[in-house]
Amino acid sequence: MTAVQQITVLGATGSIGLSTLDVIARHPDRYQVFALTGFTRLAELLALCVKHEPRFAVVPEAAAASRLQQDLRGAGLATQVLVGEQGLCEVASAPEVDAVMAAIVGAAGLRPTLAAVEAGKKILLANKEALVMSGALFMQAVGKSGSVLLPIDSEHNAIFQCMPADFSRGLSRVGVRRILLTASGGPFRQTPLEELEHVSPEQACAHPNWSMGRKISVDSASMMNKGLELIEACWLFDARPSQVEVVVHPQSVIHSLVDYVDGSVLAQLGNPDMRTPIANALAWPERIDSGVAPLDLFAIARLDFQAPDEQRFPCLRLARQAAEAGNSAPAMLNAANEVAVSAFLERRIRYPEIASIIDEVLTREPVVAVNELDAVFAADARARVLAQQWLQRNGR
């Protein structure tokens, strides 16, 4: 009998966290929740703690921690509440933990994810920003600690499944010619360009295929999400940006493909449900039931493909430029995007201005080497300052 694995879920109240807990609950003989973390949805975090009875919960502030601790005691639970980034790093690196779901959105997830890496944990990486920001430093830490890094993004998990087991030897050595990264095209794939000036946050968050959080939904609408995934794919699979091609596939059934030098193209298909890649990574190299319905090809009937329109999706072009520039450029791209998307969700800017802000930040700030984590955070901070200056200068 295999020992029950202890799982920390960073970002438990988000869509990835909830899907992870759904899969875990289906396999109580295999997995137990060690820690859950939340940011603003404290009532939801309390409910999850009552259901899963973790040893630890983490919230950002002491006042929230005190309230949650009192509520947990009232519910008869022994769950201990920790606070802030230090608490996140503690539950990510605790000796008892076997695997960490890294699902905190944005730059805030970098330090706790790195703490899990440095502790040699099995990392289920949903926080693409951590790898986008720190790139080489992150992968060096993985290599040094012996941590197992498994991608959760449906596209990267699909690529992982289509790659040979020894892909780390180098793509050319294992016969891989290119990676084909699929994208749905989001809710604005066919919206007339002149109407994009007037789209609302609600429209941007109404993804046709996937159920996601607000920030990643906007990123999907702008295809910045695909740009970040392009950068992530380069690091995960040691690929050059020129080896990663983005293909718009509206049905979101083929999650990505790998093109081999002999003419073979391997693809991974499935219903658009994040429980599939989560279950794949949780159980790897085994397979477990995810709760996802079988794929009905007859109901789908057709699969369409087209090239992305860079006039419609300038964020994708900016992300590829950052990938090619390397060094501090991806961290600046990510930071500027986080500020811009937040401003759009707050109705302070129009949708096309997301790309305008990012473009200005990348144009104004020179690319510098990032040989240590402090340099990554310095680039992140500088980009945020420049993005805020754009907002102030334009009266937003």
From Swiss-Prot:
Keyword annotations: Isoprene biosynthesis, Manganese, Metal-binding, NADP, Oxidoreductase
Report the family membership.
Belongs to the DXR family.
Function, in words: Catalyzes the NADPH-dependent rearrangement and reduction of 1-deoxy-D-xylulose-5-phosphate (DXP) to 2-C-methyl-D-erythritol 4-phosphate (MEP).
Its EC number(s): 1.1.1.267
**Full protein name:** 1-deoxy-D-xylulose 5-phosphate reductoisomerase
Q: Which residues bind NADPH?
A: 13-16, 127, 129, 213
> Which branch of life, at top level?
Bacteria
Q: In which pathway does it act?
A: Isoprenoid biosynthesis; isopentenyl diphosphate biosynthesis via DXP pathway; isopentenyl diphosphate from 1-deoxy-D-xylulose 5-phosphate: step 1/6
Tell me which HAMAP family the record gives.
Answer: DXP_reductoisom
Q: Which residues bind 1-deoxy-D-xylulose 5-phosphate?
A: 128, 154-155, 184, 207, 220, 225-226, 229
What reactions does this protein catalyze?
A: 2-C-methyl-D-erythritol 4-phosphate + NADP(+) = 1-deoxy-D-xylulose 5-phosphate + NADPH + H(+)
A Pfam family the protein falls into: DXPR_C
- Originating species: Pseudomonas fluorescens (strain ATCC BAA-477 / NRRL B-23932 / Pf-5)
* Stored NCBIfam families: Dxr (TIGR00243), PRK05447.1-1 (NF003938), PRK12464.1 (NF009114)
